């Protein structure tokens, strides 16, 4: 994140250089999670008529996962949340051990989930479990979702679907309601995973 070429650094630099620009800082600006607390959480609760038992989402900035999870857990403290992570990210190990292990950090292809930092929007107390998904498993699921379901979604979304399905195989029982949000479209991946 401190490398001047990183997107974190470039965004900060551009904000300083461009008059009247705005740097939303989606990682540490708690308005990110608050927006999902006020909108996404209530929408899911209403649309499932309060029957949701499990909520799964990719974790990158933490906003959609944690803002939504906070609202849903206030409605149902027994709700289980599953964060989807990628190999090369620190989230899962940090949740399980409390240790920020730099050995967990290495390059990966999946965009939109996983990080080599701990954003302020990631509230680990709101995430019950983490599942890691490989780049390959996500890529395979990308094509499967497009063919079988007609869903043209981004790489992080298919990681969430793959991870949630893996979790569901072992943990869900009849009557459970699992909601996964898919906040990314596939157009930006035409030259990547869809190529």
Where are these regions (language model features)?
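Surface-exposed amphipathic alpha-helices with a cationic face
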Residues: 69-76, 168
């Amino acid at each position: 994140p401190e490398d001047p070429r990183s997107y974190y650094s470039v965004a900060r630099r551009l904000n300083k250089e461009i008059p009247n620009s705005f740097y939303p800082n989606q990682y540490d600006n708690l308005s990110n999670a608050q927006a999902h607390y006020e909108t996404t959480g209530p929408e899911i609760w209403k649309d499932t008529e309060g029957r949701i038992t499990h909520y799964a989402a990719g974790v990158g900035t933490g906003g959609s996962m944690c803002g939504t999870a906070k609202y849903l857990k206030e409605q149902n403290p027994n709700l289980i949340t599953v964060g989807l992570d990628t190999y090369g990210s620190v989230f899962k190990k940090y949740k399980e051990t409390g240790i920020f292990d730099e050995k967990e950090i290495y390059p990966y292809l999946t965009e939109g989930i996983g990080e080599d930092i701990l954003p302020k929007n990631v509230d680990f107390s709101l995430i019950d479990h983490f599942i890691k998904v490989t780049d390959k498993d996500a890529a395979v699921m990308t094509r499967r979702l497009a063919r079988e379901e007609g869903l043209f979604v981004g790489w992080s979304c298919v990681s969430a679907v793959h991870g949630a399905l893996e979790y569901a195989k072992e943990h869900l029982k009849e009557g459970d309601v699992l909601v996964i949000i898919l906040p990314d479209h596939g157009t930006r991946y035409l030259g990547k995973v869809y190529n």
